[in-house]
Amino acid sequence: MTMSSFLINSNYIEPKFPPCEEYTQHSGSAGSSASYHPHHPHPHAPPPPPPPPPPHLHAAHPGPALPEYFPRPRREPGYQAPAAPPGPPGPPPEALYPAQAPSYPQAPYSYSSAGSAAPGPEQPPPGASPPPPPPAKGHPGPAQPLLPGHALQRRCEAAPAAGAGTGPGCALLPDKSLPGLKGKEPVVYPWMKKIHVSTVNPNYSGGEPKRSRTAYTRQQVLELEKEFHFNRYLTRRRRIEIAHTLCLSERQVKIWFQNRRMKWKKDHKLPNTKMRSSNQPSLGQQQAKAQTQGHPRPLDGAAPNAAAL
């Protein structure tokens, strides 16, 4: 508010500059710019002193004066060149300020027009902004290498335009053109497969075993032996716990305990329950017979004496 009121009430001379339209004209712009002189005092005369601010401005707005606005009239006349005989007209503004055209679209045109002297019809005028360059078919510049997947996709996209007979060719292209992608898949060899056969195959040649034998480590055998020392039979819950602890399957733990029980019976010379014949007496019958032989039945005459006692 203070600045606007100061500019209105003071006798400040606004410097005048030539309009901007004169710089864009093709003819007569240099002469007009050279002969144009704003209405300023004579350059040889001393610059007029700055007018004092009106008294009512200080009364209305008390405060420090703005010194940055007073030296401007002193500097403005300094921009005017001293009086000199008019020289030859300078170059037109177009030579000093050429139209700035982007440099990146010139590369494709320079490549395509290298063989011919006259530029092609695709070259834009110097004043207008050039459109984006179309993709050149015979561009000799270095092209970025395409991945196999992108090249295959472009071939298959161009196949329907050529004809319907190229459809099966695109279906067979991935197997031939992408060998690197298949190498990333895990390779499973025949010796890595496990074959579980429940029935006997008469045509089996014996090239591959039916089931590989489990090789237990010392730590696994030690833990299994400790468990067998306390319990010769395992519940399913305990079997699952041992299998998870020793990194084995439930079937491996079950088979190990079966084999270990058979060995224990053989060491203790106990009859095998699976191979036992029907004519042999059971273990319970043998124990009952031994008890009857150790304690004979009392006689008939001794019964009254025993009762009397």
Swiss-Prot record:
InterPro entries reported for this sequence: Antp_homeobox_Deformed_sf (IPR050609), HD (IPR001356), HD_metazoa (IPR020479), Homeobox_Antennapedia_CS (IPR001827), Homeobox_CS (IPR017970), Homeodomain-like_sf (IPR009057)
Any one of the GO BP annotations: embryonic skeletal system morphogenesis
Residue ranges, compositional bias (Pro residues): 44-56, 83-95, 121-145
SMART domains: HOX
Annotated spans, Disordered: 17-148, 267-309
Compositionally biased region (Polar residues): 274-294
Free-text note regarding domains: The proline stretch works as a part of the transcriptional activation domain.
Role noted for this protein: Sequence-specific transcription factor which is part of a developmental regulatory system that provides cells with specific positional identities on the anterior-posterior axis. Binds to sites in the 5'-flanking sequence of its coding region with various affinities. The consensus sequences of the high and low affinity binding sites are 5'-TAATGA[CG]-3' and 5'-CTAATTTT-3'.
Protein name listed in UniProt: Homeobox protein Hox-A4
Name of the coding gene: HOXA4
